[in-house]
């Protein structure tokens, strides 16, 4: 059985503001690995959470 991808939101912070970037992953662990790529590029990731649909 294939596991579908979930939309996660990464919260990143800069010097004066924070913003959210969507990533698609099969698990929180996979989303964390994607967040590490942003950190390697110089961004500060402060939160990873699944998208909550209203």
Curated annotation (Swiss-Prot):
Keyword Amino-acid biosynthesis: no
Entry's Gene Ontology BP terms: symbiont-mediated suppression of host gene expression
Residues making up the signal peptide according to the UniProt record: none
One Pfam family here: RNA_pol_inhib
Gene3D superfamilies: RNA polymerase inhibitor (3.10.20.510)
Keyword line: Bacterial host gene expression shutoff by virus, Bacterial host transcription shutoff by virus, Host gene expression shutoff by virus, Host-virus interaction
Job of this protein: Acts as an inhibitor of bacterial RNA polymerase.
Protein name: Bacterial RNA polymerase inhibitor
């Amino acid at each position: 059985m294939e596991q579908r991808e979930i939309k996660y939101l990464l919260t990143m912070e800069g010097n004066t503001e924070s913003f959210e970037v969507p990533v698609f992953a099969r698990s929180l662990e996979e989303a964390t690995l994607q967040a590490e790529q942003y950190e390697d590029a110089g961004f500060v990731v402060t939160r990873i959470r699944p998208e909550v649909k209203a």
